[in-house]
């Protein structure tokens, strides 16, 4: 049976729009299901609660870190770091991509404050320590290629227990049903 996996894409938004789009396109090209804040509409629900639900419903968490730390909550932690911590603590496999050279990032896409730069540096270190193998990217095209290779490898080597399976009319679904 062919399984499709849901992959949550975590990244800051304004500075990584093109990179997020490239990641989502690569996930779709490999016939899987992307999830991320681009798809959030009006819900009448707190943002963090909805993000947690989306991560819980995902099989993998793809993290892209560029030059910004991101929007922070009332405790001074970025939503991207909160997503990473949440996925890590839930045992969801993380597929991390970090910008290789912070000095090559255009000024408008860099963290504007010293405090933000310090938080970003600490976050990068945390990801490097906790997430296992990390891949480093230099530009959007490089990132897209690395995502394609990493996704193929991760899905082959570490297939998630869950996922989406198409059930057609000839499939006996009795084995899939859960009874109370």
Each predicted region: which residue ranges?
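A short helix->loop->beta-strand "cap" motif at the edges of active sites that frequently abuts
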Residues: 89-102
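C-terminal interaction surface of TIR/SEFIR-family domains
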Residues: 104-180
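Short loop/turn segments at strand-loop or loop-helix junctions that form parts
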Residues: 63-67, 98-101
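Conserved TIR/SEFIR loop-to-helix hotspot centered on a Trp-containing motif
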Residues: 42-45, 67-89
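Conserved N-terminal substructure of TIR/SEFIR domains
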Residues: 1-64, 90, 169-180
């Amino acid at each position: 049976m062919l399984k499709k996996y849901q992959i949550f894409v975590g990244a800051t938004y304004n500075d990584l729009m093109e990179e997020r789009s490239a990641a989502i396109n690569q996930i779709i090209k490999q016939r899987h299901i992307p999830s991320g804040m681009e798809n959030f509409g009006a819900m009448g629900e707190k943002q963090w609660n909805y993000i947690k639900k989306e991560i819980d419903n995902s099989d993998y968490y793809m993290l892209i870190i560029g030059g910004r730390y991101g929007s922070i909550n009332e405790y001074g932690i970025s939503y991207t770091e909160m997503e990473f911590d949440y996925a890590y603590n839930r045992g969801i496999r993380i597929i991390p991509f970090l910008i290789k050279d912070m000095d090559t990032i255009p000024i408008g896409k860099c963290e504007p404050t010293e405090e933000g730069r310090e938080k970003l540096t600490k976050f990068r270190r945390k990801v490097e320590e906790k997430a296992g193998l990390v891949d480093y990217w230099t530009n959007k095209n490089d990132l897209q290629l690395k995502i394609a290779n990493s996704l193929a490898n991760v899905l082959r080597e570490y297939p998630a227990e869950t996922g989406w399976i198409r059930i057609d009319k000839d499939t006996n679904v009795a084995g899939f049903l859960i009874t109370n």
